[in-house]
Amino acid sequence: MTIDTPAREDQTLAATHRAMWALGDYALMAEEVMAPLGPILVAAAGIGPGVRVLDVAAGSGNISLPAAKTGATVISTDLTPELLQRSQARAAQQGLTLQYQEANAQALPFADDEFDTVISAIGVMFAPDHQAAADELVRVCRPGGTIGVISWTCEGFFGRMLATIRPYRPSVSADLPPSALWGREAYVTGLLGDGVTGLKTARGLLEVKRFDTAQAVHDYFKNNYGPTIEAYAHIGDNAVLAAELDRQLVELAAQYLSDGVMEWEYLLLTAEKR
């Protein structure tokens, strides 16, 4: 008889999330519409030459690559090796040198106080255990170092889109907190707790000019975004449910699309480790 342990359950959940993020082409989405967030976080975190940087849940490198361009020493980590491979290819094309390591944001394979700056943009927010992930950000940052995070807000387009598809996603159990809670000031302040000081937050809008119609937004997410692909795969041949999710996503996109422009709200957070 096999007895499941918390560690085994964590490994199973990590494997499920790794497979989900490998669906579609999240790297394409990140590079086409989310790339402007990279320089924003790099500047806010004060990254520059010689700074030891850890990028957590780095994806295909939207933050890691701009950080490396400043002359910083960057280690780029992610749970999904396919995304790290994409980042490596981009780095080679740009003549940049980074270190890469597959890692779970909830159990980073690094020593305490190892980095000057620890960053994550639209990444750590998707770790299932928010508190464990926040604790890890703080743990691996040196005292006096900087923690910087960008997350989608609950109230913005992306947060509402995630809420819309959540009931259809088998990998998201009812007891898991919504990812976009990282976009609420009070919530993320509570996660970081007494481990940081000088915490600052600011809401911003990512301007997206990729789509002409709400249907185009729907199609883009349905074809490229892992969580959406997972939702439709779970629906399967149920035409009624598929049509209902189609309707919800198109109507949501229409609320945020005006003259070919969307604005996706995010929360930028910076703090100093005590």
From Swiss-Prot:
Keywords of this entry: Signal
Q: Which Pfam families match?
A: Methyltransf_11
- For whether the record's keyword set contains Signal, the answer is yes
Q: Where is the signal peptide?
A: 1-30
Provide the coiled-coil residue spans: none
Q: Does the keyword Signal apply?
A: yes
Q: Name one GO molecular function term.
A: S-adenosylmethionine-dependent methyltransferase activity
Q: Which family does it belong to?
A: To M.tuberculosis Rv1403c.
Sorted alphabetically, which PANTHER family does this protein's record hold?
2-METHOXY-6-POLYPRENYL-1,4-BENZOQUINOL METHYLASE, MITOCHONDRIAL (PTHR43591:SF24), METHYLTRANSFERASE (PTHR43591)
What is the name listed in the Swiss-Prot or TrEMBL entry for this protein?
A: Uncharacterized protein Rv1405c
Q: Which organism is it from?
A: Mycobacterium tuberculosis (strain ATCC 25618 / H37Rv)
